[in-house]
Amino acid sequence: MFLLLLLIPLIGIGFVTIEGNYGLSLINNIRIKSIALTTSIINLVVSLIMFILFDFSSKQFQFIEEHYQISYFDIYLGVDGLSIYFILLTTIIMPIAILCNWNSIQSKNVLSFVVIMLLLETLLLAVFLVLDVLLFYIFFESILPPLFLLIGLFGSSNKVRASFYLFLYTLLGSLFMLLSIVAMSSIMGTTDFDALSKSNFNYVTQLFLFYGIFIAFAVKTPVSFLNTWLLKAHVESPLSGSIILAGIVLKLSLYGIFRLILPLLPKASLNYTYIIYVIGVITIIYASFSTLRTIDIKELIAYSSVSHAAVYSIGAFSNTIQGIEGSIALGLAHGFVSSGLFICAGGILYDRSSTRLITYYRGMAQVMPIFSVLFFILSLGNSGTPLTLNFIGEFMSLYGVFERMPLLGVLASTSIVFSAAYTIFMYNRIVFGGSYSIYFVENIGDVTRREFIMLLVFVVLTVLFGIYPAPILDGLHYSVSSLIYSIN
């Protein structure tokens, strides 16, 4: 059944390619974008149907499909109570990522843009669907070429430099994971998730495998001092690229922790938790101080993403139900809120004023009241305010860390103070901050219907699951309990 999720975007690529052969007139471009948007919405509907049919009382993989491809190599697809939420996150964000650049892509580049977007959706979903370590690595790395092209073709002035930073940093970091996977395969004779989870690597072997995989995920998260590629990619990327990076790509390492590190290398992950916590706390403090000093809106949101990613990453290593469930909830919440904030910064403010400097804006509440309300709710989420999903995820993640190592838990909790400080500064300076300029009255209008729909989706999801998180937390319970049992 989950094969549909991979085939639908590929079928959409076929349709838009056929439509592109008729020329790139204005009407054809609208049709091409409409086909791509419809395709991604159909994929969202399919994922929702599968979510409804999913049995959350089972800890096993479901809807398993086997497809024989080449000699002695089978491709297994399946989903469990952890991956289903990442699949939903992907299918929710992708239609909005296509919609957010609806008017900004030049006519001659429309076909290339939608093909890259649909291909990215297929590859991202494949990461969450495959049940094989080697295939996980292949699809984990295969998203780099489309992202490279997305930033390199449609980014801003320094797009080529940013795309090369993205490609080289993540590719070199992932080579260590490849070495670990090859070692696993040579020792066990298989790369199947289920078979490897039943293996019992000795401690020294686990240690070397752990470091190889962790380095790859540390670059992808990214941790402090390895985040240069992310900042450049966010700042230079088109809006859709920023949304995909913050909303989905940064969650690949979180998912990889639950698939590769915790169940396959339990001794190493338990014994070296303190190192991960120290790195996480340093990342939180470093990213937070960097956020407090920047005046670039996209850069502020990017640094904020690094800080929140560090929180849900250390929560994942807490070895507690609360910490692991909280890390996934915070990962989902961050996907919604950061995507919404990037739309506010790069899709609304920048499109109208052509600047990302916070000091340029003031008094937006007077000329953009609807935008100000939606921006306010997303800012509350980013600062971890109660009644938002971010609060639940952050509180549970930090609770898990505190249960494991109280001192580092206290230091990690400074993220709450820092996130409130820089988010309040950003919102207050843009929305209030004195009288508005006459330029805003003449050139800036409130959100359009398209922009309102995009922001409303993220606002509703953030608040709805913040008030009623049971569909997420209850659904995760069996899978998380099973994961902790396998670790211990």
UniProtKB/Swiss-Prot annotation:
Query: Which Gene Ontology BP annotations are present?
Result: ATP synthesis coupled electron transport; electron transport coupled proton transport
* Main localization category: mitochondrion
Which keywords does this chain's UniProt record carry? Electron transport, Membrane, Mitochondrion, NAD, Respiratory chain, Translocase, Transmembrane, Transmembrane helix, Transport, Ubiquinone
Name of one Pfam family that matches: Proton_antipo_M
- Parts forming coiled coils: none
Q: What EC number(s) does the entry state?
A: 7.1.1.2
Superkingdom of the source species: Eukaryota
Q: What membrane topology does the annotation report for this chain?
A: Multi-pass membrane protein
Any idea which GO molecular function terms this record carries?
A: NADH dehydrogenase (ubiquinone) activity; ubiquinone binding
Transmembrane regions listed in the UniProt entry: 1-21, 34-54, 79-99, 110-130, 134-154, 164-184, 207-227, 238-258, 272-292, 301-321, 328-348, 367-387, 407-427, 452-472
EC class, as a word, reads: translocase
- Catalytic activity, per the record? a ubiquinone + NADH + 5 H(+)(in) = a ubiquinol + NAD(+) + 4 H(+)(out)
Example GO CC term: the record gives: mitochondrial membrane
Q: Where in the cell is it found?
A: Mitochondrion membrane
Q: Which family does it belong to?
A: Belongs to the complex I subunit 4 family.
- Function summary: Core subunit of the mitochondrial membrane respiratory chain NADH dehydrogenase (Complex I) that is believed to belong to the minimal assembly required for catalysis. Complex I functions in the transfer of electrons from NADH to the respiratory chain. The immediate electron acceptor for the enzyme is believed to be ubiquinone.
What this protein is called in its record is NADH-ubiquinone oxidoreductase chain 4
Q: To which species is this protein native?
A: Aspergillus amstelodami
State which gene encodes it. ND4
